[in-house]
Amino acid sequence: MGIFSIANQHIRFAVKLACAIVLALFIGFHFQLETPRWAVLTAAIVAAGPAFAAGGEPYSGAIRYRGMLRIIGTFIGCIAALIIIISMIRAPLLMILVCCVWAGFCTWISSLVRIENSYAWGLSGYTALIIVITIQMEPLLTPQFALERCSEIVIGIGCAILADLLFSPRSIKQEVDRELDSLLVAQYQLMQLCIKHGDSEEVDNAWGDLVRRTAALEGMRSNLNMESSRWVRANRRLKALNTLSLTLITQSCETYLIQNTRPELITDTFRELFETPVETVQDVHRQLKRMRRVIVWTGERETPVTLYSWVGAATRYLLLKRGVISNTKISATEEEILQGEPVVKVESAERHHAMVNFWRTTLSCILGTLFWLWTGWTSGNGAMVMIAVVTSLAMRLPNPRMVCIDFIYGTLAALPLGLLYFLVIIPNTQQSMLLLCLSLAVLGFFIGIEVQKRRLGSMGALASTINIIVLDNPMTFHFSQFLDSALGQIVGCMLAFIVILLVRDKSKDRTGRVLLNQFVSAAVSAMTTNVVRRKENRLPALYQQLFLLMNKFPGDLPKFRLALTMIIAHQRLRDAPIPVNEDLSVFHRQLRRTADHVISAGSDDKRRRYFGQLLDELDIYQEKLRIWEAPPQVTEPVKRLTGMLHKYQNALTDS
């Protein structure tokens, strides 16, 4: 396919984007809004953003969800702007500097919350800055401007959602159904590899791929939940299926590790069962039936605990999978599974990274302020707005430098494109609403094609072009103003890029170490006799951290194996029959406190000291288990955990 070719699957969304832009433009001028540009710009960004992220037409619900986040972020930003202006109207410079800090604060929060919700916080940061900069000459008009901006943005979002509904958005349900079947087959094949105890690299690739697919399935669940309220039952089942899929991965990998020291635990009967190849979910179903009969015949005690747990989890997976596909009423058996264990949310390991993002956004906005005041450039405020927009949106993504480059390319492309519209097209079509709408529809259609291809600069070009062409009421054509706006966008993106290059993010290694220590803390916290604590389901949170580790350090197998070993230790100790007595309970609390000190230590020396203390306490704990005659199901996992911590002590303590 050529670089400028148009694929059939891209046409529907391109028409959808064009329709959203035209609707926003028509309503904006029909109701005599002062700046219909905001409504058009909002409709374009809300519709095109999910398509750029997805690399194609977004699934149903994605545009609505992004629109709701934009409304929330706009209202938070407007309220913050009003508070700042009312408090500091007599000190304009201080007011702008406080807005710069507010933008940095919102970026800091957006770096810590879920990536899906971070958009609202990033938006609220630069919305406040836009309002404060715009009303510098007429501060008494702040409430009116804030109200107009909110109204125009709500209109733009409404147009994007209406266009999405008119052109029958894609449902993700069929993709979810197919992935559930494919995932179960892949889980079975992973267990086959682990039973064979073959090449470790092949096993690593298999479980790593399953972790990524399970994370992707969780993302699909979020999309399905946004799509319609009729998928509430499917959403509940998919939440439980996420835990079951992670449980299957854990049990398979533990089976592999057990065979490193005790291969005799896996009997010939189960080895023969897992030699049968499977290709479909029906094949897996038949094999699970055979395994359940074998387990009943041999007895639970004669079955390795990992295989017994794996078969049980796979059976529950099949039951819930059928419920998701049919979306029928939840049965009593399913309800028992769904009411299982409360899922625990883990604390973010990227606090240092979030602080770097705070300083990047704050410093770039302050730099823009100084540049504006020093030069006295009439479009310095436009450059400041672009700085805030670029840094707020770029910081929450894995590669902020590429986001900046995308914006730079986009603003450069917007200059000739905007020039064409400003000098030729809009002056010749402003007397006819139909021609004006058609001209912008053509712009939206062709950029909509490129956005779905993730063409570098396409998203920035769409937003920047709409921002600089004259879509105000009434229209005024001042070439110097147009040129200032276009150059202001380019300069703002350049300054933001310079700040991102200068303020280096060196938090990667620290984040990796914090993640690994959180795995250690989770394994240690599983050593408890508290019934409520033992029922807590930390597995989704632990695998979420593992997924983050895999993204931060692609290809670093030793780190992945260490993290997975800690997850296995956590699951095994969580189910271990630890003797219930006050002596052990007190020592469990001491172990948890020491593990928390390891995570929160501010220097390598403190971290090494606390880690050494943790190792000493684990040695004492093993002695206590021997005194209290704990069974091998407890002593062996604790011994393995202690050995792993001794082996990887340097990796867990050094920066």
From Swiss-Prot:
Q: List the subcellular locations.
A: Cell inner membrane
The cysteines covalently paired via disulfide bonds are: none
Q: Which Pfam families match?
A: FUSC
Membrane topology (UniProt): Multi-pass membrane protein
The protein's GO terms of the molecular function aspect are: transmembrane transporter activity
Q: Which residues cross the membrane?
A: 13-33, 38-58, 69-89, 93-113, 121-141, 152-172, 370-390, 407-427, 431-451, 459-479, 482-502
Looking at the UniProt record for this protein, which Gene Ontology cellular component terms does it annotate, in alphabetical order?
plasma membrane
Q: Which keywords does this chain's UniProt record carry?
A: Cell inner membrane, Cell membrane, Membrane, Transmembrane, Transmembrane helix, Transport
Tell me where on the tree of life, at the top rank, the source sits. Answer: Bacteria
| One biological process term in Gene Ontology | carboxylic acid transport
* Keyword Repeat annotated: no
Q: Spell out the PANTHER family in the cross-references.
A: MULTIDRUG RESISTANCE PROTEIN MDTO, P-HYDROXYBENZOIC ACID EFFLUX PUMP SUBUNIT-RELATED
Q: Which family does it belong to?
A: Belongs to the aromatic acid exporter ArAE (TC 2.A.85) family.
What job does the chain carry out?
Answer: Forms an efflux pump with AaeA. Could function as a metabolic relief valve, allowing to eliminate certain compounds when they accumulate to high levels in the cell.
Q: What is this protein called?
A: p-hydroxybenzoic acid efflux pump subunit AaeB
Which species expresses this protein natively?
A: Salmonella heidelberg (strain SL476)
Q: What are the leading ranks of the lineage?
A: Bacteria, Pseudomonadati, Pseudomonadota, Gammaproteobacteria, Enterobacterales
